[in-house]
Amino acid sequence: MSGEPQIRYAKTADGFSIAYYAMGSGPAVVDLGPPPASHLRMELQIPEIRTWYERFAAQRTFVRLDGRGTGLSEREIAEYSVESLVLDLEAVVEALELDHFTLIGQVNSGLAAIAYAARHAEQVDALILWCAYTRGSEFFDDSGTLFLRDALSRDWGMFTESAANSRFGWSHGDHAHRFAELWREAVTPDVQALLMDGLHGADVSGLLASVEAPTLVLQREKRGIDVARRIAASIRSAHLVIFDGTSAAPYLPDAEQIWCEIARFIGLESEPEAVVRNSRGEASRGLLTILFTDIVGHTEMMQRLGDAKGRDVLREHERITRATLKQHGGAEVKTMGDGFMASFGSVTAAMECAIALQRAFAAHTASM
């Protein structure tokens, strides 16, 4: 994407001016973002976020909006609710004259995404929910969130820094600090409090059965698996995928895995311009099959075995994986500490490699 997308404004049914942009071409993907930390201009200055959005814009018309009270939208509000964000979305959809589109709801905005999809089944082709919940109490009664709510009334800077680190994980401190700066510019403490108090009593669980769109439920293992399972079980065409870790951002730390799930779900190429070399050094271009490996319970394993023995297990995992990839013509794209991302020229080769890996690890475990 060259340059910055043009910011436009839409008027809601209750009179608020909502900032939005659309970039790219093709069928639309509307991302509600992670309110209230939403600022259309500032988020594009954060490389990880910009790269994530540009992936959509490379193959679709990608739409983002700042909900009322946040970012570049009208900032003076008296209340915040699921209904208000639905009205904001309706205004942008009408302004862009979108007949149908893919809708993405992240964390807090998942409530509005579910409500909109239930009410406008004819417009939502697909629904993607990232770390979403259906009852405000499932999120705001968490001990960590209660601590942050208390911090909000005492120190705005401490609140945003702590909330950002909680959101992304303490291992991504630099990114969390940049996002905390965005957070402070995107919203005032008063509006932050309005959102937390206004959404605490929200409940869209009764609308799940009315969602007709195929739905992809993406959830972090340590951010409420039971909630995600309940959502997936209540939507008739839902598919649940669980990822390791705690980060509430889809672009950190395992963006490739998450992107491949989204791309597969809505019919995008995972890497439209990818050129890779297999183990024989032969270049290939076009559609690729991506294989991911992962050590389940890696953190718990390291705690149980200790650093020295844990590293021995990781080294053996790497040795077996690389040898098996070579045998099956796979190309190592990158390693992620406790897992690999590899590409293959066909689904068959990837499946055969996956089966071989399972057998190799089973044989190694049996010999220990």
Language-model segments: residues:
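A structural signal for long alpha-helical coiled-coils and helix-turn connectors
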Residues: 200, 299, 362-365
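Catalytic NTP-binding/metal-coordinating core of nucleotidyl cyclase/transferase enzymes
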Residues: 276-360
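Active-site phosphate-binding and catalytic loops of NTP-dependent enzymes
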Residues: 274-276, 361-368
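Short, flexible active-site-proximal loops enriched in glycine and acidic residues
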Residues: 104, 130, 328-329, 367-368
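Residues at secondary-structure transition points
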Residues: 47, 80, 308, 312, ...
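Ligand-binding pocket scaffold of soluble enzyme catalytic domains
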Residues: 2-271
